[in-house]
């Protein structure tokens, strides 16, 4: 994976500092704070991300926290990143710390970080709501610890309509999915939520810490397809061809 080891450490103060308190003037306006979950999964919605974001960027943003899985939401038809993702943490303290990143500036974007709202399922298990018209799968991971199903939803309470059309997501962004058969739908968040987002003023922007990525050290994608014209065995030739040449 490309090297993304340096976000500005000044942006990572302890809970309640640096990035603007939730619901304060430095945040996204007046909002009702959600209760932290008392049992897994401990999942955060992260929105308003640059469209060239990759998993390594998310790992770097939350590098000091205990991340279990990352799900980058992509358009079903174009496979383009839609500007938001879901990050599950191993314990509630990491989720609590992640919430303090809400309002931090990444380039000219003000990050949105919130608790992904969960709801109990009729048949057991725990799901998330993030409304949308269609169901999309989000499977694939390393260290499998529970399946990902698409029949239930995710909801963060943010309005991401400007991030693009509805669509699905590409499987297998990072590690295992949440336990107890959690399920997802990855369309834009529900309207009419209990949180309102407003763009920060210039004064507020000046007070917020800025997150900066170093250039990626790997210029060529690691999963790039090999050149089909390249010789698999270098300059080696079949044995029959070698014998024929010696006889000549």
Swiss-Prot record:
List the biased-composition ranges (Polar residues).
220-230
Q: Which residues form the RRM domain?
A: 42-118
Segment forming the signal sequence: none
Q: Which SMART domains has this protein been placed in? A: RRM
- Positions where N-acetylalanine occurs in the chain: 2
Compositional bias (Gly residues) spans? 15-29
GO molecular function annotation: ribosomal small subunit binding; RNA strand annealing activity; RNA strand-exchange activity; translation initiation factor activity
The biological process GO terms on file are: developmental growth; eukaryotic translation initiation factor 4F complex assembly; formation of translation preinitiation complex; sexual reproduction
Known role: Stimulates the RNA helicase activity of EIF4A in the translation initiation complex. Binds weakly mRNA.
* Name of the protein in its database record: Eukaryotic translation initiation factor 4H
Q: Which organism is it from?
A: Rattus norvegicus
């Amino acid at each position: 994976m490309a090297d993304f080891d340096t976000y500005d450490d000044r942006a990572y103060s302890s809970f309640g500092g640096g990035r603007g308190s939730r619901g304060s003037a430095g945040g996204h306006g007046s909002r009702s704070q959600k209760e932290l979950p008392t049992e897994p999964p401990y999942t955060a919605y992260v929105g308003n991300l640059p469209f060239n974001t990759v998993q390594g960027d998310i790992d770097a943003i939350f590098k000091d926290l205990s991340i279990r899985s990352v799900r980058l939401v992509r358009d079903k038809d174009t496979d383009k990143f839609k500007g938001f993702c879901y990050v599950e943490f191993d314990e509630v303290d990491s989720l609590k710390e992640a919430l303090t990143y809400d309002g931090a500036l990444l380039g000219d974007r003000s990050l949105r970080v919130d608790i992904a709202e969960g709801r109990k399922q009729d048949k057991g298990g725990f799901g998330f709501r993030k409304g949308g018209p269609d169901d999309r799968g989000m499977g694939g991971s390393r260290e499998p610890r529970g399946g990902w199903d698409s029949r239930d939803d995710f909801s963060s309470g943010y309005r991401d309509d400007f991030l693009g059309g509805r669509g699905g997501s590409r499987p297998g962004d990072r590690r295992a999915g949440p336990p107890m058969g959690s399920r997802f739908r990855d369309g834009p968040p529900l309207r009419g939520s209990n949180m309102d987002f407003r763009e920060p003023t210039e004064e507020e922007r000046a007070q917020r810490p800025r997150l900066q990525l170093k250039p990626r050290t790997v210029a060529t994608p690691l999963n790039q397809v090999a050149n089909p014209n390249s010789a698999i065995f270098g300059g080696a030739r079949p044995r029959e061809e070698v014998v024929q040449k010696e006889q000549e």
